[in-house]
């Protein structure tokens, strides 16, 4: 089972991915986590990515595509994977399809967790205040920019997957359990 999870920052993609990982024994491929790890390690890629992410902008397609291609061929992806935070642009979606076709892999479902902006701001603020571990991008100014970038760059990707009859939209303003149940309903058709 190969899935893509979409949703604006703070929509709960990571939480839902964790549930799916445990239920289906698949792995999560999070470009955000991969990039944060590079930043933490202080690699050249990490330094470049940090300067871009600190502004709330997207890291270049070339960097992300290269990371994903290397990751997707690892043995732990054989049972399936969830892409979280990728693809974010139409070019990335097309490049992903090209990579997957070359590897004889396909995406089964694309799930969008839909949440409105006010709800996101409240959720992210709560996450930042209630956590001992803070993320540099958990503040309202950066979040607002990330939402603008998400809408501008990512919404055309949703249309792309809708045209391929792979997109399923879930109400992300429900509690975690109900969002998960709605996702499970979509996946029962696999």
Describe the residue ranges of each PLM region.
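Glycine-rich phosphate-binding loop of ATP-dependent small-molecule kinases
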Residues: 1-190
């Amino acid at each position: 089972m190969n899935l893509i999870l979409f949703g604006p920052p703070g929509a709960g993609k990571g939480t839902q991915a964790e549930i799916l990982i445990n239920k289906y024994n698949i792995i999560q491929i999070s470009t955000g986590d991969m990039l944060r790890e590079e930043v933490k390690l202080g690699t050249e890629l990490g330094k470049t990515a940090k300067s871009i992410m600190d502004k709330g902008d997207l890291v270049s397609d070339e960097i992300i595509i290269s990371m994903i291609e290397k990751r997707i061929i690892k043995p732990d992806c054989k049972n399936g994977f969830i892409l979280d935070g990728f693809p974010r642009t139409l070019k990335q979606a097309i490049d992903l399809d090209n990579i997957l076709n070359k590897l004889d892999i396909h995406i089964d479902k694309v799930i969008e967790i839909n949440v409105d902006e006010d709800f996101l701001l409240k959720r992210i603020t709560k996450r930042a205040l209630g956590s001992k571990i803070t993320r540099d991008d958990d503040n309202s100014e950066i979040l607002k920019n990330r939402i603008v970038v998400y809408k501008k760059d990512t919404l055309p990707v949703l249309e792309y997957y809708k045209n391929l009859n792979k997109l399923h939209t879930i109400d992300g303003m429900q509690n975690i359990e109900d969002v998960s149940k709605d996702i499970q309903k979509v996946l029962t058709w696999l």
